[in-house]
């Protein structure tokens, strides 16, 4: 019991019990009323935790939210887009014209084997690599 006495803390469990742990004091400041089926929940009811407080009085709080709409607002239709009726372009969408952006539209294009053979036949330095020459000794 000595350890339990040392661990007892007023901030956690309230004042120390008078005789033994089974006889904890019931505080009148923590009284909870049984719900009578009203619209109030336990979180919405007022509780007092002070020593010299008056009996509880139910405080009903009402809140309202008003949404102010602009003068030209039409509730049934979607707002007009400032960009017009064209959808936004994705970097992965096909280009509008192959000549519009230089080599940029073809940057992610997969090269076919026929392109590789055309470059090799043209004498391009970036053509397919051939096997290294064999050296005789």
UniProtKB/Swiss-Prot annotation:
Translocase keyword on record: no
Record key words, sorted: Phosphoprotein
Biased composition, class Pro residues, residue ranges: 88-97
Residue ranges with Polar residues bias: 32-43, 127-137
Protein name (Swiss-Prot/TrEMBL): Dormancy-associated protein homolog 3
Recorded family membership: Belongs to the DRM1/ARP family.
InterPro entries, per database record: DRM/ARP
Xref: PANTHER family: DORMANCY-ASSOCIATED PROTEIN 1, DORMANCY-ASSOCIATED PROTEIN HOMOLOG 3
Protein's UniProt keywords contain RNA-binding: no
Region of interest (Disordered), ranges: 1-55, 69-137
């Amino acid at each position: 019991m000595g350890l339990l006495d040392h661990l007892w803390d007023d901030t956690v469990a309230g004042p120390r019990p008078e005789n033994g742990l089974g006889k904890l004091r019931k505080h009148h400041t923590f009284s909870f009323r049984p719900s009578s089926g009203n619209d109030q929940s336990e979180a919405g009811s007022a509780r007092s935790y002070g020593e010299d407080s008056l009996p509880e009085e139910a405080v009903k709080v009402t809140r309202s939210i008003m949404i102010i709409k602009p003068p030209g607002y039409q509730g049934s239709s979607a707002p007009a887009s400032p960009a017009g009726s064209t959808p936004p372009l994705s970097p992965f969408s096909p280009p509008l014209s192959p000549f519009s952006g230089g080599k940029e539209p073809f940057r992610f294009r997969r090269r076919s084997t026929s392109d590789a053979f055309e470059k090799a036949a043209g004498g391009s330095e970036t053509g397919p690599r051939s096997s290294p020459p064999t050296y005789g000794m």
